[in-house]
Amino acid sequence: MNLKKFKYKKVSSTNDIAMQKIRQGYKSGVIISDKQTRGRGQHGKKWVSNKWNLFFSIFFIINKKIQTSTLVISNLRIIKKILSNYIKSKIKIKRPNDITVNKKKICGILNETLFYNNLKFLVIGIGINIVSSPNIGDYPTTNLNEVTNRRVSKTKLLNKIIKAFDIKIKWLL
């Protein structure tokens, strides 16, 4: 499957735009934005979207029988594996939906489902701190450039993740 990319400078939320695209008739795609004004995390928590970090949502049709709650960990494992190509430090999955490096959050995902035209869609919102570490209260954060001591290409990282999910999608149809 070839995921169509939709690129934006600023959106309310990449997951919201993905759901709009589904309602417009798109069956799959990737929403990419430089900035989110109302990004969200688990249980409606605000997702802080600092400029230069990576914010995107992948959406596609899945088999109606699949329990999407079981997909969160497998989605995190895909991201963790790709990040491990860049990071030498200990990377861990922190339930329910984060990835940490040295006990600091570097990534979060949000899985949402949408039933539309008798089809079940999965929308996976992904945020990865690449350049800056947002201040989110008592939860320490880090970023990819900080833990690698080098500049990481946002585009190359995004393309690796899209390729990995493109392979996974074939198993979920």
Which residue stretches match the model-derived regions?
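Structured alpha-helical
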Residues: 145
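Conserved, helical-rich catalytic subdomain that frames metal- and/or nucleotide-binding sites
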Residues: 149-173
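Short glycine- and Lys/Arg-enriched binding-loop motifs that mark or flank ligand-binding interfaces
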Residues: 35-40, 99, 121-123
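N-terminal lobe of the biotin/lipoate ligase/transferase fold
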Residues: 1-85, 89, 107, 151-152, ...
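Conserved beta-strand-loop-short alpha-helix elements that form
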Residues: 122-131
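Cytochrome P450 core scaffold surrounding the K-helix E-X-X-R motif
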Residues: 131-140
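Acidic (Asp/Glu) carboxylate-rich active-site/surface patches
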Residues: 85-117, 127
